[in-house]
Amino acid sequence: MWGGRFSEATDSFVAAFTASVGFDQRFARHDIQGSIAHATMLKECSILEADDVATIIDGLQQVLREIEAGEFNWSIALEDVHMNVESRLTDIVGAVGKKLHTGRSRNDQVATDIRLWLREETDNIIALLVRLQSGLLDLAEQHTDTIMPGFTHLQTAQPVSFGHHVMAWFEMLYRDTERLVDARRRINQMPLGSAALAGTTFPIDRTITAELLGFEGICQNSLDAVSDRDFAIEFTSAASILMMHMSRMSEEIILWMSAQFNFVQIPDRFCTGSSIMPQKKNPDVPELVRGKAARVFGQLMTLLSLMKSQPLAYNKDNQEDKEPLFDCVDTLTGSLLAFADMLPNITPNKENMRAATMKGYATATDLADYLVRNGVAFRDAHEVVGNAVALGIKEGVDLSDLSLAQLQQFSNAIGDDVFDFLTLEGSLAARDHLGGTAPNQVKQAISRGRTRLEVFA
């Protein structure tokens, strides 16, 4: 395909070392899709004859059928998916197949393939995210009154509902979905027609190709179009943030499944046992998702490092962009598939959650707020409650178990109505505002969540 310039054959090791067909054959369907659109545009612009284009398209469709049937013979000697497809096309249709590459370079061809492939994968990932979030809304709806400790510094802080906690997960994932939807807009720009780097001398019409391929825009500068991979980096960045959120969720599930917490159980099908300890039920799926987050972070660093020193325009370095991107997509997709099945099937241990909430003086802030409403300055109220907690620790009881007389020794602003504010249910109900953990607020948040998800349907 380019041997005319050279006086000796490429070394066999170099040919194998520089070939990408071992991995970029994954683009085959998208490569053929792009070629069919390109050929159609060449016909519409009277650059190729209609009969030639019809022959080329028929040949490309046969190549695709062979690939999908597993009958295609991939050749390292042909370097990449593009030349393998073109070579087979020429075998099928003859010399007319050599006309396909008119007005095109592999530089804009591969950039188009990546964008077509990544656009499709992004849509699949968004659909998985929506499925996962829908499952979380269903889970939260079942547990708007299920009380558990809310934590700061992994210490009991204030009572919340399990449903409220699940809705925090939902909000994380919703922002992740927004990021991917936004990244898709920049993925969905067409580089085809930029040729090697400067455009082509043929009178092409890029709008025809863009419309045929479903691109919402056209890359405006040929140098930039063939050489930048920021759209892939942006996707991988959004994927990394998403995996970070899933890693945090995994960490909580792992902790909560431990005997020391015993807050939740997940179905056995998401766990494994031990080869030596028969009692073990190991949370392998969340542990693996937590570990796989590091893998996606690494692929982001790979792509950033790959691009950081490249001058314009295309360089062979960019051959190394595909495997990190493939691995990122595969890792993220697998993690989402696991989570979409696992998370909605979490079963909380309500009794243990409630008992844990009672152990940590979780209503201390409620007592302080009560005092403030009765005219005590907050800093003074803070000290009063600290003294009451110290007494509770000494007596080995919760604040709600102290007598009225015991509480009143710290402040005469405490009346017999104080116990309404020291119950766990009262604490939840008191936080009755947008974003609060009151059961009716969580129910409203769930309803809003269902409406918000419709945007991505």
UniProtKB/Swiss-Prot annotation:
One of its GO terms (biological process) is arginine biosynthetic process via ornithine. The keyword Cytoplasm applies. GO terms for molecular function: argininosuccinate lyase activity. Keywords: Amino-acid biosynthesis, Arginine biosynthesis, Cytoplasm, Lyase. GO terms for cellular component: cytosol. Its EC number is 4.3.2.1. It comes from the Bacteria. Pfam families: ASL_C2, Lyase_1. It is found in: Cytoplasm. Transmembrane segments: none annotated. Its main location: cytoplasm. InterPro entries: Arg_succ_lyase_C (IPR029419), Argininosuccinate_lyase (IPR009049), Fumarase/histidase_N (IPR024083), Fumarate_lyase_CS (IPR020557), Fumarate_lyase_fam (IPR000362), Fumarate_lyase_N (IPR022761), L-Aspartase-like (IPR008948). The keyword Cytoplasm applies. Pathway: Amino-acid biosynthesis; L-arginine biosynthesis; L-arginine from L-ornithine and carbamoyl phosphate: step 3/3. It catalyses: 2-(N(omega)-L-arginino)succinate = fumarate + L-arginine. SUPFAM superfamilies: L-aspartase-like. HAMAP family: Arg_succ_lyase (MF_00006). Belongs to the lyase 1 family. Argininosuccinate lyase subfamily. This is Argininosuccinate lyase. It comes from Psychrobacter arcticus (strain DSM 17307 / VKM B-2377 / 273-4). The gene is argH.
